[in-house]
């Protein structure tokens, strides 16, 4: 009897680092159901779109992609081959059954908190059902997700993401996360430590803890006391082989003393912090429901820099929020000048349906948003390039992560997240080596062995 060919799944990931982690865990759940991953959509028996709902027109982009996959499914049907189509992630959560109504070729819609049920859902799909699973059973998800095989962890590389917290209770008026990811939920300490230990045992050298509001994480520690993220980082730093720790994304209101002390006292906690502020105008910050002022943010950065003088800062900015005046925008520019960011992400405000911001008056014209964004990005780019140039001639610990794009090269990563191009003979993947920065590229550094 001829053996049945293995089923293959193609997962396309949109958006944030947590979606990357979620896609990996979907792959783990499907591996237990007999699927192997493929990078070629033409080979797939199942196509999953793991979607993001943060930016404007996110849903329309998904529907456009589904149109292309629908045509592929029709061609497969003519040839007598089945192709299943699924939509996962935050667009799935927000749109629900509307996805199947608008795109009937879709077989399943599964939210961020229910993808551990994929094998059961697929069994029902093969029985002829169309499935929409979008509840918020987050504890159930992490309790039931299968662990990846060691070989799969090794294949993914020497850096890894580890989700420790999901959801957000801040309700910033521009943001859909509380509606698509739910309220804040923290994973238990034992579960996080066990996953980090498995990663380290498989050769992972750097772990980035993920959460929509990661520094709101809290849980009962191994000593029975209530822990925050700082105490968790101290515990993870004890794991043999785990040389580097990071976390993202944070809210200024949840940067407590213990977390700041972790930056001071833990060599393995990298001196890089992504701490979004969104605006430098107190009036706009209030309208955004950020619950801090520009002065609060700057004072917090002073405390963090006093604890870790070599820390590099990253941020998020939104320009053109409803009611933003030229004076408000200039306040943002002034805050950026004061902070001097090593890197940052900046966007035009885009109204998200169902959020308070979308209902506010005095929306800023698109042309003015464009002009302000260009001015802000020019300043941020100048600061980023200045930070890179300041490292030329210095000796830096670099984690070698992967082969380079060019023959004879490998790519490493500085403590401040910049890619570093080195000679392939400088070290093996997973090594942390000392290099001397020789020059800068547009988004990377070049180095030689120190």
From Swiss-Prot:
Record's protein name: tRNA-2-methylthio-N(6)-dimethylallyladenosine synthase
SMART domains registered for this protein in UniProt: Elp3 (SM00729)
Superkingdom classification of source: Bacteria
Chain sites annotated for binding [4Fe-4S] cluster 2: 168, 172, 175
PANTHER family listed in its UniProt record: CDK5 REGULATORY SUBUNIT-ASSOCIATED PROTEIN 1, MITOCHONDRIAL TRNA METHYLTHIOTRANSFERASE CDK5RAP1
Top-level class of the enzyme under EC nomenclature: transferase
Gene expressing this chain: miaB
Cofactor, how bound (note): Binds 2 [4Fe-4S] clusters. One cluster is coordinated with 3 cysteines and an exchangeable S-adenosyl-L-methionine.
Keyword field: 4Fe-4S, Cytoplasm, Iron, Iron-sulfur, Metal-binding, S-adenosyl-L-methionine, Transferase, tRNA processing
Role played: Catalyzes the methylthiolation of N6-(dimethylallyl)adenosine (i(6)A), leading to the formation of 2-methylthio-N6-(dimethylallyl)adenosine (ms(2)i(6)A) at position 37 in tRNAs that read codons beginning with uridine.
Compartment(s) where it occurs, according to its Swiss-Prot or TrEMBL record: Cytoplasm
Binding residue positions for [4Fe-4S] cluster 1: 16, 52, 90
NCBIfam families reported in the protein's UniProt record: miaB-methiolase (TIGR01574), MiaB/RimO family radical SAM methylthiotransferase (TIGR00089)
Predominant place of localization: cytoplasm
GO terms under cellular component: cytosol
């Amino acid at each position: 009897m001829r053996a049945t060919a293995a089923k293959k799944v193609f997962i396309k990931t949109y958006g944030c680092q947590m979606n990357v982690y979620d896609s990996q865990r979907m792959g783990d759940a499907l591996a237990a159901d007999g699927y192997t991953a493929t990078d070629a959509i033409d080979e797939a028996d199942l196509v999953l779109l793991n979607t993001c709902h943060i930016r404007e027109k996110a849903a329309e982009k998904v529907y456009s992609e589904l149109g292309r996959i629908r045509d592929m499914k029709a061609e497969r049907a003519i040839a007598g081959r089945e192709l299943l189509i699924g939509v996962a992630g935050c667009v799935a959560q927000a749109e629900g059954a509307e996805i199947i109504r608008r795109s009937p070729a879709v077989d399943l819609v599964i939210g961020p908190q229910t993808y551990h049920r994929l094998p059961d859902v697929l069994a029902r799909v093969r029985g002829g059902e169309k499935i929409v699973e979008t509840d918020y059973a987050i504890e159930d998800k992490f309790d039931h997700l299968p662990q990846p095989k060691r070989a799969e962890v090794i294949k993914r590389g020497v850096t890894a993401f580890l989700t420790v917290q999901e959801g957000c209770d801040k309700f910033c008026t521009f943001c859909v996360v509380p509606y698509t990811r739910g309220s804040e939920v923290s994973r238990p300490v034992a579960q996080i430590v066990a996953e980090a230990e498995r990663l380290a045992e498989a050769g992972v050298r750097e772990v980035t803890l993920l959460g929509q509001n990661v520094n709101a994480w809290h849980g009962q520690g191994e000593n029975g006391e209530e822990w925050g993220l700082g105490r968790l980082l101290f515990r993870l730093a004890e794991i043999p082989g785990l040389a580097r720790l990071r976390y993202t994304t944070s809210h200024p209101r949840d940067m407590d003393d213990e977390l700041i002390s972790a930056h001071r006292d833990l060599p393995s906690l990298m001196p890089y912090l992504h701490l979004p502020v969104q605006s430098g105008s107190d009036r706009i910050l209030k309208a955004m429901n950020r619950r801090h002022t520009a002065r609060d943010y700057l004072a917090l950065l002073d405390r963090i820099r006093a604890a870790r003088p070599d820390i590099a800062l990253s941020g998020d900015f939104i320009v053109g929020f409803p009611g933003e005046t030229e004076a408000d925008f200039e306040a943002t520019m002034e805050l950026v000048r004061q902070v001097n960011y090593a890197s940052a992400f900046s966007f035009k405000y885009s109204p998200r349906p169902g959020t308070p911001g979308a209902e506010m008056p005095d929306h800023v014209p698109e042309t003015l948003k464009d002009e302000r964004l260009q001015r802000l990005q020019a300043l941020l780019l100048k600061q980023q390039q200045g930070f890179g140039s300041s490292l030329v001639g210095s000796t830096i610990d670099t984690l070698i992560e992967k082969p380079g794009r060019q023959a004879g090269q490998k790519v490493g990563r500085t403590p401040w997240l910049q890619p570093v191009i080195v000679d392939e003979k400088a070290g093996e993947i997973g090594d942390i080596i000392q290099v001397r920065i020789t020059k800068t590229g547009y988004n990377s550094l070049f180095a030689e062995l120190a």
